[in-house]
Every structure is written in structure tokens, then in C-alpha cells.
């Protein structure tokens, strides 16, 4: 049973055999009550949390609180992100007040992940509905993220919906000599007048 617990803990990202062993021993030696609370919370979350039918983020309702907020629908914007964690990051800026669409990943043909695997058929349907005026592409600046953004931009073009890409560049407080060449290239190409 101990081996089963350690193996189950290894499903978490970044948890290898040693970390799983430490966690299991900690719960059994020092925090059995916490372990039971963790098991209950995990069981409840796995049962009751699903995906929003509009944006695909995690929610306990059929439609999440962002998608049901009428103020979020006024500007006709949706921000396409790869994961629910990306929504939290964008929301933390306080600079965006539209709706979202969560891909739950990115296109990766080598891994067998195609458009329907990341919900692009659902996004296509939403674009056809006609209530979206702009799609803000906020996928990660990786090869897969860029390919996904390009695919979605083409989808937007088919539906005559404006598509924009979030800016990439030198981080605030960063030093140019430490920035990689690709990031610096994006910064130079995406410069704007002040």
C-alpha cells in the first residue's frame, strides 16, 4: 500500500521517486489528518470540477464566472491561452477585461496532438457564432505555441475576425546582454513609437 501511495504521488509534475517517498512518509508520520483532508479535497475536485462549455477552463458550473459576466462580453474579445494557469497570469495584470478560450495544450503533430485535441473545433464554432470581434493570441512563445497561434490566426481570417498576438520581448528589469537572440529579435521587430 505504501508503494501504491508513492506511485500515485509520482503523477504530479516534478515529483520523482525520492520526492514521492518524502511526501508519503511525511503524511504517514506527521500529518495523517492533513493526508485525509488532501484525499477528500482531491476526490471532491476530481468529481465536481469540470470544464466551462464556453471557454474550457476549470469550473464547478456549466459556464464559468468569467463567461457569465455580462461586462466581459461587451468588447467582443477573447484571449486564447494554453492553460487555466495562463488565465490567472493574465487576470493578475488587471489589463484585460474580456473573455478567454483555453486550449489545454498546443498543437504538436509529433506527439499526435491535432486541432480537435485542443478544442479548435469548439473555437471555430464560437467564431462562426459572430459574437467575437477580436481574438488575442496569448500562447507560449515556443515553436508549438507559435504554430498554434498561426493556425488560429488563419481560422480567424476565414471568419473575418481580427487576430492579434501578445508582444514578446525583453523583460522589465532585464539586461540586453543576457537576453537570448530570439527574444531580442522579437523585441526589435515588435518595437513601437513612443
UniProtKB/Swiss-Prot annotation:
UniProtKB keywords: DNA damage, DNA recombination, DNA repair, Metal-binding, Zinc, Zinc-finger
Superkingdom of origin organism: Bacteria
InterPro entries per the UniProt record, alphabetical: DNA_Rcmb_RecR, Rcmb_RecR, Rcmb_RecR_Znf, TOPRIM_dom, TOPRIM_RecR
Protein family per UniProt: Belongs to the RecR family.
Pfam families to which the protein is assigned, alphabetical: RecR_C, RecR_HhH, RecR_ZnF, Toprim_4
PROSITE patterns for the chain: RECR (PS01300), TOPRIM (PS50880)
One record GO biological process: DNA repair
Gene that encodes it: recR
Function: May play a role in DNA repair. It seems to be involved in an RecBC-independent recombinational process of DNA repair. It may act with RecF and RecO.
Record GO terms (molecular function): DNA binding; zinc ion binding
Organism expressing this protein natively: Vibrio campbellii (strain ATCC BAA-1116)
Zinc fingers classed as C4-type: ranges: 52-67
Record carries keyword Electron transport: no
Ranges of residues in domain Toprim: 76-171
Protein name per UniProt: Recombination protein RecR
Amino acid at each position: 500500500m505504501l508503494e501504491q501511495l508513492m506511485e500515485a504521488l509520482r503523477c504530479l509534475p516534478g515529483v520523482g521517486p525520492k520526492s514521492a517517498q518524502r511526501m508519503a512518509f511525511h503524511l504517514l508520520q506527521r500529518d495523517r489528518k492533513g493526508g485525509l483532508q488532501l484525499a477528500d479535497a482531491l476526490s471532491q475536485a476530481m468529481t465536481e470540477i469540470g470544464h466551462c462549455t464556453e471557454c474550457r477552463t476549470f469550473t464547478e458550473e456549466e459556464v464559468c464566472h468569467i463567461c457569465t459576466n455580462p461586462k466581459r462580453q461587451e468588447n467582443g474579445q477573447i484571449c486564447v491561452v494554453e492553460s487555466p494557469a495562463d488565465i490567472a497570469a493574465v487576470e493578475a495584470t488587471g489589463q484585460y477585461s474580456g473573455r478567454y478560450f483555453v486550449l489545454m495544450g498546443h498543437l504538436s503533430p509529433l506527439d499526435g496532438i491535432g486541432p480537435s485535441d485542443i478544442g479548435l473545433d469548439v473555437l471555430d464554432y464560437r467564431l462562426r457564432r459572430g459574437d467575437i470581434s477580436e481574438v488575442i493570441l496569448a500562447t507560449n512563445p515556443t515553436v508549438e505555441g507559435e504554430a498554434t497561434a498561426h493556425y488560429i490566426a488563419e481560422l480567424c481570417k476565414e471568419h473575418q475576425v481580427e487576430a492579434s498576438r501578445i508582444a514578446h520581448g525583453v523583460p522589465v528589469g532585464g539586461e540586453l546582454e543576457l537576453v537570448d537572440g530570439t527574444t531580442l529579435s522579437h523585441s526589435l521587430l515588435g518595437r513601437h513609437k513612443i
